[in-house]
Amino acid sequence: MRLLLVPAVLASLLPLGYAAESSTVRCPSAKPKPLKFSKPTFIDKERAGGEPVSIVAQDGSIIVSAHAGTTHIYKDPQAAPGAYDFLRSYYNQTLNWRSTDGGKTWTYVGLAGAPEGPHSPTSTGFSDPDLTMDAGGNLYNVEIDLANVAVFGSPDDGQSWPTANPIAASGDRPWVTGAEENEVFLYVNLPKQLWRSTDGGLTFSLVSTSFPADSKLLVDPLNPKKGLLGPLGSGGVAISPDDGQTWKDYPAPLGDSTQFFGAIAADRRGWVYAANAGGYSGSSDVEPNGEVTFNYFNRQTKRWAKAPIRIPTPKGDALWPWIIAGDDGRVAVTWYQTHAGKEDKFYAYVAYTTNGHGSTVRCSDGSKRFVPPQFQVANASGRPIHAGKICLSGTTCNANPSFEGGDRRLGDFFTVNFDHKGNLFVVSGDTTLKNALGGPKPVANPIFIKQTAGDKMLVKPDKTRKTRCLFPLPTC
C-alpha cells in the first residue's frame, strides 16, 4: 500500500504550497504548534489501573474507570508482596475515580460517593470498563465477569453509580455509547451483539447480531438522533442511519496495526478519522519496524483519502492506537512506542493535527493550494510507562509458561481524550512502581498525562454547568 509520508510531503507538495518558499511564491504553514505534556501523575498508587477509559462530565469533572486486575495479574513470584494493590479494592467490580480540578487530584468513587468500597449495589464485573454520556448528561459504564455484561449509571456527574442492570447481556468486551437523554447503546464483541436502552440503561432490547461495526460506536454528528458510526476491524467506518438497524461499511486504506479493537473518531463537523499503529508482534519481537498511519473520510464523497498518511515516529515499534477528535479538523492519536535498541521500554506517544482532513491555504501569488494533514508528535509520557514484554494474547496470556512473556498488566489498550477546555490528556496503565520489597507489582497503576502546550481540540471551551447533587439528594 502506498503511504503518504508527512515529512516527505513537504518537498513533494511544493507546487501545492505547504509552507513552501520559492523565489516567487510563499504559502502559509498548516502545521499545529509544538505539543507538550506534563509529567505522568498517578491517579492511584494503590489500586489496579489497566485499560483505563475516561469521560468529561457536563460540569467539567473528569471520570476515569479501569480494570480491577483479575485477568491482568503478573505471575512473577517477586510481585507477590504487591498484592495489596489488587486486594484492597477488589469487589468484583471495575474501579472508578473522579477529578474536579483538571486531573491534579483524584477521588476514588465507592457506593453513594464513599471513598472506599464497591461502586454499585447490584452491578458485578471485574473487567472491560467503558464510559459514555447521553445528551442529558447521564453517565454510563460497563463491566463483565467473562459471562454477564453489566451496565451501570451515574445521574450525578460521576459522584456515585447507583443504578445498574447486572445482566444486560452476555459476552466479552462490551462498549457503551450514550445518545439521546436516557438512551444508551451496548455493543458486545463476542458473540457480536448490539443492544439499545431508552430508560437509562435499566432494560435493553436487542437490535442486531449481524453488522459490520467492530468495537466502540459513536453518535453520528450529522445525524445525532438516529445515526451511529462504528470502526471496522481492518480499518474504516461503518455508518448506520437508523439506530443500528442497517449499516453501510467503508474500508479505509491504512498501514499495519497491532490492536485488538478498531478505533475511529468523528469531529463536530462530521468528518471521520481512523488510525493504525503497528510493528510490535509480542514478547519475542526485536525488529524495530513500527509505523503509525492516519486517514480521513469525506462524508460528502463517501471516500477515504486514497493513501494513508504516515505519522512521523522514532525508529522502533508501535501498538494500540486510540483516536479522538474535537472541532473541525482537530484530531489526536495516541499509541505505545518503543525505541530501536530498547525494545522492552514502552512510551506513550501522542500526535495531533488541526487540519485533519486537509486544508486550503492562500499563497503569496493569490493562488489557493491544498495542504494534507500536518502533525506534531510528542513523547507524552517522557519516560517508559512499562519495562519488559507485553503479551498480546488476551486472557490466554495467563497460560504462558513465562511470567515475563505473559505480562498483561497493561491490558489490551489505553486511551486519549480532551477536557472541556480542549486540553488533551492520556490515561494509561503504568507498571513502574515497585512493591515494598523492591520487586514489581502484580497489577498496573493508573496514570494521567495532560497537555501543557500546543493547540487545543476546541476553538472555544465547552460550556459547563453546576455539579448535580449527589444522588438521591434533592438539594445541595
Where are these regions (language model features)?
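Extracellular, repeat-based ectodomains that mediate carbohydrate processing or recognition
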Residues: 22-476
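Secretory targeting and sorting signals
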Residues: 1-20
